[in-house]
């Protein structure tokens, strides 16, 4: 039996959605009437508008990534994919393209993270979170992405991981599988390969960039088709708010805390704290637009939940500001902060779950 507690949030939502479909018909009719009434009290159009703004941004950002990959592939092809020759003849051009790739990813990342709370928390959209940001590779069957990468040269990368991981680690050179083989990525010509110097496998990078753009467009289309319900919004809050411990663990294991000893290959373009703040910022927007509905269950509790969620967002933003100002957090501090954030997040999710029960609105989470 699948252990749902070990799955990414998006997979958990999708599994719960399937189980919910088997529920009692009379209960479903009652919940449907509650949903209809609830829709009048929540500004669901504002939530969808926020989502569409971000899916459109991601489409544009992935097009920029793909265009850069096309340019890099063309340069590598002209050198017959001889990467030593490529560096010898076009070192500055390669360096510029790699730096552009890193900048393009850094731009695309918040376009997704700011909407992740909605995408990962809504059953009809949750698979795209697995594809873009949460899914693992083939070594993790329960959470692996549902796609393979087919390259122009005819190679197949079976379930290689989510696209944020693929693009970031290729652009920054932190995943050797996606790098050119046999040539040191010495982009500045100083005789050493340092962190941030990358020589992507052009064949793989182009295929990954093209597919990233394809799935970004699919997400945009699915978001346009989505008809939001109050249950969707409350589910997103309940599922995505109490994910702090895993995010803080990724931060602890990243270069921002562990330095060269980092076990995380991703989260190098920006601190995981940035992602946490972006995700929580999106969830604050979702809650703001359903608070009038939650207040019908308990107005005082609704205000307390609002305050608690804003404080949790403020905690993440404050930690990020300290880190950006030069403070070096320790692994022990990351553990403590993660536990504190998770405790707060679980309390918030519990309050929203209670409100949904009083309103007879189903939360589609296991």
What are these model-derived regions, one by one?
Residues 32-366:
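Mature extracytoplasmic or organellar-lumen-exposed domains after removal of signal/transit peptides
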Residues 1-20:
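Sec-dependent bacterial lipoprotein signal peptides
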Residues 20-21, 311:
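A general secondary-structure boundary signal
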Residues 22-27:
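Bacterial signal peptide processing site
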